[in-house]
Amino acid sequence: MKFLGVILLASFLLIATFLIGLIPLYYIDKQKSSIVTNQEGADSISDFTTNADTQTINDDVSSYRVKIAVLSQFGIGMLLGTSFMLVIPEGIKACVEHDGNVGVNLLIGFLGVYVLDRLVTLWVSRKQTVYTHDAVKFQSWKDIINHPRQIWMNLIQNNVVFALFIHGLSDGIALGTTTNNDSLLIVVLIAIVIHKIPAVLSLTSLMVSRQNLMKWEVICNVFLFASSTPIGYIVLSLLNLSHSPTMDWISGNLLLMSGGSLLYASFTAFVGGDSHDHDLSVEQEVVLPHDESVYVLIGVCIPLVISYCISEE
């Protein structure tokens, strides 16, 4: 029964993230169609009307970016609050019960993701990938089925997608450590989902508008990114479901390590130091209705309230 729940939750994560990631693709296609329609009717439409349509499109894009920026700041607050108020306290409790070292586990979780992040950054910077799509151009879903190897090659060659794929795996591992704690699982799941929504929206927008990738390649990359967290979650959950003394000890220490990894994710996003987020950043290009600290604090307050509700139970 637990295994079925793991598969259903992983499927939900995959489908939800994938569908949300397709929204910018649909939105941009719709805007392009609108521009083409305006250009075709340019002879019969006044310059004033054309300029008005262009201004409307620009306003829509600006509004879209503001919403992503607000959601991104809110997600940072959720991750920060979840790390400090829920995952780390529960991890310390589990770690002490299994005679683990609190400081070492936190440090391993934090530095583990940091080192992995740096290795990915160094690898892609040395490679200096240039997007020359000479190999296979995906024109339809049939091309995707016929060339599965090219899908992974595109992932590895795309610096931003590859870095976010690795980051998604670490999120899934953090989620998998909470399999045996339902209340904590729900809160961590919500925090990760809210964190992934602006990431996948920005990723799709980046691939379409800046990298000029073809539609089906964008869809493939979005699907791979969407699958990263479910993969990490399923692997750790399956290990967690085997109730052996060794696995109990490992899971007890892994929960605190996952707290360290979540702390790294929230900290780097909070201070703007996450290297692969620079290309995805939209906050620097838009003016938010309120200061960004307002949205971060709102995000922090939700795990704070939930932590008191859980402690009362």
Curated annotation (Swiss-Prot):
Topology term for the membrane: Multi-pass membrane protein
InterPro entries: ZIP, ZIP9
Keyword presence, Ribonucleoprotein: no
Main location as per UniProt: Golgi
Localization in the cell: Golgi apparatus membrane
Record-level Gene Ontology MF annotations: manganese ion transmembrane transporter activity; zinc ion transmembrane transporter activity
Stretches in topological domain Lumenal: 1-2, 89-103, 176-183, 239-251, 307-313
A Gene Ontology BP annotation from the UniProt entry: zinc ion transmembrane transport
Segments passing through the bilayer: 3-23, 68-88, 104-124, 155-175, 184-204, 218-238, 252-272, 286-306
Pfam families according to UniProt: Zip
Example of a GO cellular component annotation carried by this entry: trans-Golgi network
Membrane topology (Cytoplasmic): 24-67, 125-154, 205-217, 273-285
UniProt keyword list: Golgi apparatus, Membrane, Transmembrane, Transmembrane helix
Biological function: Functions in the homeostasis of manganese ions.
Name recorded for this polypeptide: Metal homeostasis factor ATX2
Annotated source species: Saccharomyces cerevisiae (strain ATCC 204508 / S288c)
